[in-house]
């Protein structure tokens, strides 16, 4: 995507208090774009089972180590599609590079990328872009960005931003068969009803874009906290009550409408996603709260197997000697674990 000067970014940001996020976004062409880059040839044959992976990259701040993780992890050797969240393009914190392109090039995949936020805090950011991506071994026929209803205005946050949450809706060509693939990132600073409203827009777009019998997989960080992310006293109290927290994590669907909503729209999630926690939310005192935020949900597919892969450095024992990952001394590559599901088309 074409860059914008920092001065232009700030000038547009200054319009948000008067115009609101969406009217400012309408003035920015990059928000209407979805980058699609088919970099590799399609595999010669379609396997019976395809591996789908959800991974919140956490901006790409450990880019080289993350690329090693994707290339070296035994459970990711034969992955077909990655539903990826939080990828920078031109931000100092991730090396001022295009994270999606660097990953796609290094792991041998095609990709689609859509802009979610323009960061306004750091004048040294080349672009300050931040968004979602979908990586695929299979050709991407087309892709579009879906802007979801605002549930939190990030302009007034310490992470001062222009933008709103997005989904990337893609049509893949898997051996001549159309398959829908949707990378989603829902709002954490919202309650269950807010996330449900965001997903309603995604389902509307799926109905417009695909025939009813087209297989579709949705994957991403749905931020199913089981609480309102703005309620700091509320989730702190939950953290301090391990028994109640365990009940929340064991029955996320009771607290998060997006899960029963999936079934109401013809998508299954129970057999495609592990019940293990996927995100380590930092808490006071150097502690963390383990939450189940990352999901795969599908229609027209059957799950053969699924699992979760730790992104904590201590668990990457398979890292090749001398690699960036093997040399990495940080505690984790991302604050999210990666999740996968092996799926075949329903008969």
Which residues does each predicted region cover?
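Acidic/histidine-rich helix-loop elements
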Residues: 8, 43, 49-68, 88-92, ...
């Amino acid at each position: 995507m074409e860059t914008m000067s920092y001065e232009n970014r700030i000038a547009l940001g200054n319009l948000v208090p008067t115009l609101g996020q969406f009217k400012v976004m309408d003035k920015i062409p990059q928000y209407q774009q979805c980058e699609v880059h088919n970099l590799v040839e399609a595999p010669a044959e379609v396997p019976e089972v395809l591996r789908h992976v959800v991974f919140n990259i956490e901006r790409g701040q450990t880019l080289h180590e993350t690329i090693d993780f994707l290339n070296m992890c035994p459970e990711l050797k034969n992955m077909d599609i990655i539903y990826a969240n939080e990828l920078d393009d031109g931000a100092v914190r991730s090396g001022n590079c295009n994270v999606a392109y660097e990953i796609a090039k290094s792991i041998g995949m095609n990709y689609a990328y859509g802009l979610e936020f323009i960061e306004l805090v750091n004048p040294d950011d080349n672009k300050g872009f931040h968004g979602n991506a979908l990586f695929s071994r299979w050709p991407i026929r087309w892709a579009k960005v879906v802007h979801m209803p605002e549930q939190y205005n990030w302009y007034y946050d310490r992470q001062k931003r222009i933008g709103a949450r997005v989904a990337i809706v893609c049509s893949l060509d898997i051996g001549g068969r159309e398959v829908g693939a949707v990378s989603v990132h829902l709002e954490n600073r919202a309650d269950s009803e807010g996330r449900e409203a965001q997903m309603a827009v995604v389902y509307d777009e799926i109905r417009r874009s695909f025939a009813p019998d087209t297989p579709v997989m949705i994957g991403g960080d749905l931020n199913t906290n089981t609480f309102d992310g703005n309620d700091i006293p509320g989730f702190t109290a939950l953290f301090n009550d391990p028994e109640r927290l365990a009940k929340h994590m064991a029955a996320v669907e009771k607290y998060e409408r997006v899960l029963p909503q999936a079934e109401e729209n013809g998508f299954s999630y129970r057999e495609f996603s592990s019940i293990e926690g996927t995100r380590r939310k930092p808490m006071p005192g150097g502690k963390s709260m383990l939450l189940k935020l990352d999901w795969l949900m599908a229609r027209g597919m059957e799950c053969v197997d699924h699992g979760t892969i730790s992104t904590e450095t201590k668990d990457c024992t398979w890292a090749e000697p001398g690699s960036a990952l093997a040399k990495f001394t940080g505690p984790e590559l991302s604050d999210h674990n990666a999740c996968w599901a092996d799926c075949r088309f329903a008969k």
